[in-house]
Design a protein with these regions (language model features):
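Membrane-embedded alpha-helical signal segments
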Residues: 1-257
Length: 257
């Protein structure tokens, strides 16, 4: 019995955590199922828990499973339907290693690479302008923005987001510029406070059944994503440029105020 964030009573059983998403849960006897559902718990059987956990493990480690051979196979499959798109792409526009790195970057942040046509089209456009895989990944993410936002927040037109206070974001921008784009030099005490504030904001979102999304500038997005990846894994970090035109944002909290 998984606590989705708001339940109306406690259950007798063995307290645990859902292995896939880390939510509070209780192992209960089969005859308690109906009672648990009445209290607001999401009840799943053992097989579903195991299957979901395995699926989550595969998703979390997808980037490690994708290498040169797998990407070449994907290119070969795309070439069957779109030969002109793939012809001359590798290695004329960019080496296979760069394509692999961009796709690994996407998978590392839970972005599907199934829309291979859009990924290749974007790399064809930007690959002649830059060989920086971080820049190329950002360009691909913008091209995939509708899919990214759809997978995070669903079909709702309004997206609830967490932001950084303007003063904090500006300070991080200046720090990033001072390091030549290597990443902001954050004082340890500030980093700890940011982590805690972002964790609190993310947990509040999860408690009301909404996705935890941090909205920030394109310059800071990848750095902040790495900053929270292991401490707040359910917090998705997107940039202003990744919000589709038809979507509206609703700021639920501003960290640093």
């Amino acid at each position: 019995a998984i606590n989705p964030g708001q339940v109306y009573g406690k259950l007798d059983g063995i307290e645990t955590r859902d292995p896939a998403f880390g939510l509070e849960a209780v192992w209960i006897a089969p005859e308690q199922r109906e009672h648990a559902q009445t209290l607001g718990y999401t009840v799943v059987d053992t097989a579903t828990v195991v299957a979901t956990h395995i699926s989550q493990l595969l998703s979390n480690n997808a980037a490690k499973l994708l290498g040169y051979e797998e990407v070449q196979q994907l290119m070969d499959m795309l070439a069957k339907n779109s030969p002109k798109l793939v012809d001359g792409f590798v290695p004329d526009v960019m080496p296979l290693g760069s394509v692999v790195k961009v796709m690994q970057n996407l998978l590392n942040e839970g972005v599907s690479v199934r829309d291979l046509r859009t990924i290749v089209q974007t790399l064809l456009e930007y690959g002649t302008k830059s060989n920086d895989t971080e820049v190329l990944t950002a360009a691909v993410r913008i091209a995939l923005k509708r899919m990214i936002v759809q997978e995070i927040s669903g079909p709702e037109l309004e997206i609830p987001v967490i932001t950084l206070a303007p003063e904090l974001e500006q300070m991080l921008h200046k720090s990033m510029q001072a390091t030549g784009g290597e990443g902001p030099n954050i004082e340890p005490g500030l980093a700890e406070r940011m982590q805690q504030s972002l964790l609190d904001a993310a947990q509040k979102q999860e408690m009301v059944g909404q996705p935890a999304i941090l909205l920030t500038s394109g310059m800071l997005r990848s750095t902040l994503s790495r900053f929270v990846k292991y401490t707040i894994p359910n917090l998705r970090v997107i940039s202003y440029q990744e919000i589709p035109d038809e979507k509206q944002i609703r700021i639920v909290s501003a960290v640093g105020q």
